[in-house]
C-alpha cells in the first residue's frame, strides 16, 4: 500500500538530519536554507514487537515488517504561497503526500542559522508552526478561489455536484478565518466531497519537536491542539550509525527506552489510518498494511490482486489467541480459528490465511 508522509518545516529545523536517520539514506543536511531542493523519498520499517513473538512460534526463514514512506520536502518560508523561496515546488510536493509530519525547532544553536533577522538562539515553536500553517491555509484559499467559478457552473448542470460546490464555499469562508480545513465540522457526505478539492490543510498532521538532548523529558505545550513528539535529531543520527547492541547501550546511557524514530514511524503509520494483519508460515512472518476499516477481500488484495478477485473466505485467528495458544494448531483445537466472509472487517493484528479461486 503506497501511502506517504511528507516531512516539512522551516529551513534548518533538522528535517534532513531526521530523514537521514530514519531512512539511513544520505541526504543533504546543510546550514543554509533550501539544502533540500528535490524531495528525497525513503521507505521506513514500522517497528512491531508482535512480529518477533509470532516468529518465536513459527520459526520462519525471515521476518518482514510493515513499512511507511517518508518524503523530505524543501524548507518552507513565509510567502511560499506566492512562490517565495521554493514555495511553488514545496506546495506541489506536499500535495502529493497523504499526511504531514512537521518538524519544529526547539533546540538552540548559534551556529545553525534561522531565517533573516533571527539568531540560532531564538526559539518559537508555536510561531514557526503558525507560519507554515498560514502558508498552507493561504495556498488552499488560492486553490478554492480558482475552483469555485468552475464548480458553480458544473453544479448548475449537474445537481450531484451541488454538495461539492457548497462545501467548497463553506471551506473558503472557514479558511479565511485562519482555520485549517480539517477542523471544520462536516457531514460524511461533505467530507467525501471535500476530499475531491485536494486541500493541503485537510491532510492529517503530526508535529515533531527537534530538541536538545537535555530537553527530551520536558513537558511540551500542544501545537494546534496536538502534543508534539519529542525527538533529538542529533541523537537519532548517531543511533542510526550504531549496530543494535551498541545502540541499545547508548539508549540505556541516555535513559531512553527506544529510539525516537521508532515512535515516529509508529505514529506516522497511525496518522495515515493504517493497521497491520499478519501471515505466518515457515518461509516468513510478514506484516501487511491495510487501511483501518478494510474488508477481508481488500486485505487479500494487498497480497495479490488475484486473492481479492477470487476471494472465497478468510481463516482468521486473533493475535492474542495465536500467541496464547501457541500457534495455528492450538488455536484450531481451542475453537479460536474463525471462518470469515467478504463482509468481514479486518482487526489490527489478525493472523490470516486466505482461500481463493481464480
PLM regions: where:
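Short alpha-helical basic/polar micro-motif
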Residues: 16, 52, 92, 142, ...
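Conserved G1/Walker A P-loop phosphate-binding module
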Residues: 1-84, 88-114, 120, 126
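C-terminal-of-GTPase-core extension/linker across diverse P-loop GTPases
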Residues: 2-8, 13, 19, 150-347, ...
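Phosphate/Mg2+-binding loops and adjacent switch elements
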Residues: 81-206, 216
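Active-site-proximal flexible loops/turns
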Residues: 27, 79, 135, 147, ...
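Short, intrinsically disordered, mixed-charge
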Residues: 24, 56, 92, 134, ...
Amino acid at each position: 500500500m503506497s501511502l506517504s508522509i511528507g516531512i516539512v518545516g522551516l529551513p534548518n529545523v533538522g528535517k534532513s538530519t531526521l530523514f537521514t536517520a530514519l531512512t539511513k539514506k544520505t541526504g543533504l543536511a546543510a546550514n543554509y536554507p533550501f539544502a533540500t531542493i528535490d524531495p528525497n523519498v525513503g521507505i521506513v520499517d514500522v517497528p512491531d514487537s508482535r512480529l518477533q513473538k509470532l516468529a518465536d512460534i513459527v520459526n520462519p526463514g525471515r521476518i518482514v515488517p510493515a513499512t511507511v514512506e517518508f518524503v523530505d520536502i524543501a524548507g518552507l518560508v513565509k510567502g511560499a504561497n506566492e512562490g517565495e523561496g521554493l514555495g511553488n515546488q514545496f506546495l506541489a510536493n506536499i500535495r502529493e503526500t497523504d499526511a504531514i509530519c512537521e518538524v519544529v525547532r526547539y533546540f538552540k544553536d548559534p551556529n545553525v542559522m534561522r531565517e533573516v533577522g533571527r539568531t540560532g538562539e531564538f526559539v518559537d515553536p508555536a510561531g514557526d508552526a503558525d507560519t507554515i500553517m498560514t502558508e498552507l491555509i493561504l495556498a488552499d484559499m488560492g486553490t478554492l478561489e480558482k475552483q469555485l467559478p468552475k464548480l458553480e457552473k458544473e453544479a448548475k448542470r449537474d445537481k450531484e455536484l451541488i454538495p461539492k460546490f457548497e462545501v467548497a464555499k463553506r471551506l473558503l469562508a472557514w479558511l479565511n478565518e485562519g482555520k485549517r480545513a480539517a477542523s471544520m465540522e462536516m457531514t460524511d457526505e461533505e467530507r467525501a466531497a471535500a476530499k475531491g478539492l485536494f486541500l493541503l490543510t485537510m491532510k492529517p498532521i503530526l508535529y515533531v519537536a527537534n530538541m536538545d538532548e537535555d530537553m527530551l523529558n520536558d513537558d511540551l505545550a500542544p501545537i494546534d491542539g496536538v502534543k508534539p513528539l519529542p525527538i533529538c535529531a542529533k541523537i537519532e543520527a548517531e543511533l542510526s550509525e550504531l549496530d543494535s547492541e551498541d545502540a541499545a547501550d547508548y539508549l540505556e546511557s541516555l535513559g531512553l527506552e527506544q529510539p525516537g524514530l521508532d515512535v515516529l514511524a509508529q505514529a506516522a503509520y497511525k496518522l495515515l489510518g493504517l493497521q497491520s494483519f499478519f501471515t505466518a508460515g515457515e518461509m516468513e512472518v510478514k506484516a501487511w498494511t491495510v487501511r483501518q476499516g478494510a474488508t477481508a477481500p481488500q486485505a487479500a488484495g494487498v497480497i495479490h490482486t488475484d486473492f481479492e478477485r477470487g476471494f472465497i473466505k478468510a481463516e482468521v485467528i486473533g493475535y492474542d489467541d495465536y500467541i496464547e495458544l501457541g500457534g495455528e494448531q492450538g488455536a484450531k483445537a481451542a475453537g479460536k480459528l474463525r471462518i470469515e466472509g467478504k463482509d468481514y472487517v479486518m482487526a489490527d493484528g489478525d493472523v490470516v490465511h486466505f482461500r481463493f479461486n481464480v
